[in-house]
């Protein structure tokens, strides 16, 4: 799982310092990131849809068909004038990332290229329909996107999850949906030019990882600012997981809400209007 990418760490630590902590071993960083996510998940899992929030962020690949709300970042090696690039290649120039619409070599020009965005810019896939909401009233024929599928409402309902087999009379079976491979992130009809992760959570996960990295190097001499950042992260996780007012984390909540409704029979009452 890669919930973080290198740019997240560079907000808080220089690359040279990060390499000192990891010994330039990215496997250590990946392992401790999993540990940090597991720790955060233990606080949040009862209240938030952590399975969704902690999905990967990966470098965009034209060969991959991405599902709704999946996130990617732009990355490519710098263009080298002595190389010959095939059509469909991705290159970087002056911190911009380009998609080549024809083969290219020689001095850099923007001819036969499509600008995708800035190096490391994050995008997420737009869903084909609105995301299902437990508090919305749906009528016959309404379509929603939920957990990588498109569902059609068969009977008026509210609060009935489309992917719950008990609700088969209210929703169709659902059709898997994903974006056509090769759809460029610059296509604003298909992609959002935005990072849909909780930025607070990203910061706190980074703080937890840096704490574990420092502990690995010198367990008896962890910098006080690293300890404080770790403690702040844990305190925030505890507050976000609690029911007390004060912190509303920007993380998708579990739907339907626990205790959202109590059934006194096997079939919920319809919401009828006349």
Describe the function of each predicted region:
Residues 1-81, 101-110, 115-135, 139-140, ...:
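Conserved short "hinge" loops at termini or chain/domain junctions
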Residues 23, 27-31, 85, 220, ...:
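Soluble non-cytosolic domains of exported or imported proteins
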Residues 166:
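Trihelical helix-turn-helix/Myb-like DNA-binding core that engages the DNA major groove
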Residues 191, 207-274:
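Short loop/turn elements at secondary-structure junctions
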Residues 200-208:
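Core structural elements
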